[in-house]
Regions:
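Long, well-ordered mid-to-C-terminal structural blocks that present hydrophobic/aromatic surfaces
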Residues: 1-23, 27
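A short beta-alpha structural unit
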Residues: 3-11, 32-51, 78
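Active/binding-pocket-proximal capping segment
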Residues: 21-29, 37-40, 50-52, 95-96
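Structural signal for hydrophobic packing residues in well-ordered secondary-structure cores
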Residues: 22, 26-30, 58, 62, ...
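Short secondary-structure junctions
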Residues: 30-34, 65-68
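Zn-dependent metallopeptidase/amidohydrolase metal-coordination segment
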Residues: 65-120
């Protein structure tokens, strides 16, 4: 039996702890553990001038507040922030459902809205 896990967390120490717990359990059951690749944690920043600016632009462009939330998903921001400490990162994109499943869908109209939003962000940086 081979089990594969993609362990992710927004807090590096919690991710390391979870990997250690899985490893201990597998070894206790007589198995072996091999760790291949990882996404570094991307920790939530209380202060983010970039996020604040993006919220301001979104509200002006769409007349409503954006949904802002911290996620545990492994995204490229963790890779960039891991290489450039102090980097202010924000992840956003089009509306998607059932990500990483055979039922994954993306709202095509939201792709255009996202593109227009990116252009406005770049104009305001």
């Amino acid at each position: 039996v081979c089990l594969s896990y993609s362990v992710r967390s927004s807090v590096e120490t919690q991710k390391e702890y979870l990997v250690e717990q899985i490893s201990c359990l597998v070894k206790r059951l007589g198995g072996t553990v091999t760790c291949i690749g990882e996404y570094p944690a991307w920790e939530y920043r209380e202060q983010s001038p970039l996020r604040d600016k993006m919220i301001e632009i979104f509200e002006k462009q769409y007349g409503r507040k954006p949904i802002v939330q911290a996620l545990h998903a492994g995204v490229e921001c963790g890779l960039f922030a891991g290489q450039l400490p102090g980097l202010d990162c924000v992840s956003f994109g089009p509306d998607m459902k059932d990500i990483h499943t055979p039922k994954e869908t993306m709202d095509v109209g939201s792709v255009e809205r996202t593109w227009n939003y990116v252009l406005e962000i770049l104009r305001n940086l």
